């Protein structure tokens, strides 16, 4: 599978709230339209910027659906406290017409166990087989996805088309050399705003998923 969704600058949206602390989806859509109008290629919702742990699954799904209905290209974050919820979010994203997935590792239980992460990634990727996806790698999750696991997953899930790296310069260089540099069809997305120059100039990155939303 090839996809052009993972290119250019893709801001991760925050979740605006009303006075009663419920999500303000009208404001969410308005901000997405503003950013796309300024030249952003798409938006991400819900990544960590969107405060997904504070939202219900239904609220997250509503936000995605509202963005899609507004004609916004949206990449959906799959962070969740369990694999079943992450897979349900991915399946919903595919159903309503989202454009891609940002697949978050297993977080709370056995996060350092490679077999557990493999099973988690497989479940999420299988739930939305037509949606292009990148794995989100972050040292803050306590687990790093390495090339061997990435290519095991890619061999079975053609919708895995790239890698977002949130670590520092060394992590981004590793991703470029060992993962995306090994296959010209793979996309490398910069995940740290301060590493944008390094990512584009030294790592041949395709785009950046940034915290400017």
Residues covered by each model-derived region:
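Active-site beta->alpha loop and helix N-cap motifs at the rims of alpha/beta catalytic domains
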Residues: 2-144, 152
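Catalytic alpha/beta core domains of metabolic enzymes, predominantly
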Residues: 123-129, 138-213
């Amino acid at each position: 599978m090839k996809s052009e969704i993972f290119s250019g600058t893709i801001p991760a949206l925050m979740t605006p709230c009303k006075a009663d602390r419920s999500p303000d989806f009208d404001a969410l859509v308005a901000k997405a339209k503003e950013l796309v109008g300024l030249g952003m290629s798409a938006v991400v919702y819900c990544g960590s910027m969107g405060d997904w742990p504070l939202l219900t699954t239904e609220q997250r799904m509503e936000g995605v659906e509202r963005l899609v209905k507004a004609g916004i290209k949206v990449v959906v974050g799959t962070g969740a406290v369990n694999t079943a919820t992450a897979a349900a979010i991915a399946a919903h994203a595919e159903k309503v017409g989202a454009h891609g997935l940002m697949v978050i590792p297993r977080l709370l239980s056995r996060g350092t166990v490679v077999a557990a992460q493999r099973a988690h990634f497989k479940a999420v990727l299988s739930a939305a087989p037509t949606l292009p996806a990148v794995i989100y790698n972050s040292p803050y999750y306590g687990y790093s996805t390495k090339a061997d696991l990435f290519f095991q997953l890619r061999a079975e899930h053609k919708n895995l088309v790239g890698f977002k790296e949130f670590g520092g310069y060394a992590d981004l260089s590793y991703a470029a050399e060992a993962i995306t540099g090994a296959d010209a069809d793979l996309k490398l997305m910069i995940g740290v705003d301060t590493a944008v120059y390094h990512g584009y100039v030294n790592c041949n990155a395709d785009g950046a998923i940034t915290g400017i939303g």
